[in-house]
Regions:
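A short glycine-rich, hydrophobically flanked beta-strand micro-motif that places a catalytic Asp/Glu
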Residues: 39-41, 166-172, 242-246, 312-323
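Short, charge-patterned binding micro-sites
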Residues: 40-58, 324-328
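Glycine-rich, mobile lid/loop segments that gate access to catalytic sites or pores
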Residues: 6, 66, 73-254, 380, ...
Length: 428
């Protein structure tokens, strides 16, 4: 019997994602000016207000007000009617120095003995369901909102009423063998201007007219654009039987941090695999790579993706766990969901993984180049499944004599640079 599976995504203007992006922008500023910075930065955003808190150990001085306002402007909160606007919002900082107790437990004279920044378990997942080895429902949910943001920023005349806050959700029907049959449901909720006024008509009639226009544009503009981005096998899943729920609660004018308070780290499933695989519970944004919540989750994704790409299995979950202050992981666990292509148990695969990939925190940092300012781009539309690329980033501040220019590689954990090593190790 067929079954349904659903994943959601949220836009860069969603309150929790605004908070994530501010936290990661601050992290990037610290790392650009001091690669050894230890950062744990949390952000709260609400009506007209940004609150920053956390612990930092760094030689750099960062203008946190300026960084926060630049992020808010970049997202698109630039109008006073939003009641959360880049120039006028208050920015309060309660960032203070990192605990000496924690720092002593993490830093070592031998960098490869560097202990994990905290205890916990982290997961990586990959599937051959899509070209980027991500679950299809989540990939589609991200794509819908990426395209919606591109329209809002680059082609505003097409859907001129769009505001920054939005959410998506995609449900896919699968057969008994886990093969996608068709897209069952698409949900889009997008914040919008009040672009039809109740002049000569009732407010209810005006609201209904706005909703009909948005639904029409989603079906005839947004979805066809997203469909065209995918290969033929995925395009075939878009049929006339898709159920659409567009702004199902009706008018969505009040949104963003004015509509809902946002906090760093509240969209961890959107950030990872959309409910597929597993999650250890630790958020990513605002944390430097000494925090294994982040770095080990990236490393586990890197392992899972390279294993699936090498043909070890069609679907893989990798778990790694740490104790604070201890470099060597407590365990490496692998689950192939019965879809392994090698004559080995999952335990034997896990043992082999430990031989191929050094999972000590310092080794992860160096292998994936995580001491660079690469994190702002991860803070919206998913940390996983993205395209590795080299970009030039420029950091300006009134507190430094000249701009800091960095050529950095984004999403290094998505590289398929270990496929040959994996194939050799598994005899593939």
């Amino acid at each position: 019997m067929s079954y349904l599976f659903t994943s959601e995504s949220v836009s860069e203007g969603h309150p929790d994602k605004v908070a994530d992006q501010i936290s990661d922008a601050l992290l990037d500023e610290f790392l650009a000016n001091d690669k050894d910075s230890k950062v744990a930065c949390e952000t709260l955003v609400t009506t007209g207000q940004v609150v920053l808190a956390g612990e930092v150990k760094s030689k750099a001085y960062v203008d946190v007000q300026d960084v926060a306002r630049n992020v808010i402007k970049k997202i698109g909160y630039t109008k006073s009617e939003y009641q959360f606007e880049a120039k006028s919002c208050g920015v309060f900082s309660a960032i203070h120095e990192q605990s000496g107790d924690i720092n002593r437990g993490v830093e070592r004279e031998d960098p490869y003995s560097q202990g994990a920044g905290d205890q916990g378990m982290m997961f990586g997942y990959a599937t051959n369901e899509t070209a980027n080895y991500m679950p299809l429902a989540l990939d589609l949910a991200h794509s819908l909102l990426l395209e919606l943001a591109a329209i809002r920023k680059n082609e505003p005349k097409i859907m001129p009423y769009l505001r920054p806050d939005a959410k998506s959700q995609v449900t896919i029907e699968y057969d008994d063998n886990g093969k996608p049959l068709h897209i069952h449901t698409i949900v889009i909720s997008t914040q919008h201007d009040e672009f039809i006024e109740a002049k000569g008509i009732s407010q209810e009639e005006a609201d209904n007219a706005m909703q009909k226009r948005i639904e029409y544009d989603v079906k005839t503009i947004l979805v066809p654009r997203v469909k065209a981005q995918y290969p033929e096998n995925v395009q075939a899943l878009f049929d006339d039987n898709i159920i659409y729920h567009v702004n199902p609660t009706g008018k969505f004018v009040i949104g963003g941090p004015h509509g809902d308070t946002g906090l760093t780290g509240r969209k961890i499933i959107v950030d990872t695999y959309g409910g597929k695989g597993a999650h250890g519970g630790g958020a990513f944004s605002g944390k430097d790579p000494s925090k294994v919540d982040r770095s080990a989750a990236y490393a586990a994704r890197h392992i899972a993706k390279n294993l699936v790409a090498a043909g070890v299995a069609d679907e893989i979950l990798v778990q790694v766990a740490y104790a604070i202050g201890v470099a060597k992981p407590m365990n490496i666990f692998v689950n192939t969901y019965g879809r392994s292509n090698v004559n080995m148990t999952d335990g034997e695969i896990a043992q082999k993984v430990g031989e191929i990939f050094d999972m000590r925190p310092k080794a992860i940092e160096e292998r994936l180049k995580l001491r660079n300012p690469i994190y702002f781009e991860t803070a919206s539309y998913g940390h996983m499944g993205r395209q590795p690329q080299v970009v030039r980033k420029v950091f300006n501040s009134r507190y430094i004599p000249k701009p800091v220019v960095c050529d950095v590689e984004l999403f290094t954990w998505e590289k398929l640079d270990y496929v040959d090593k994996v194939k050799a190790a598994f005899g593939l």
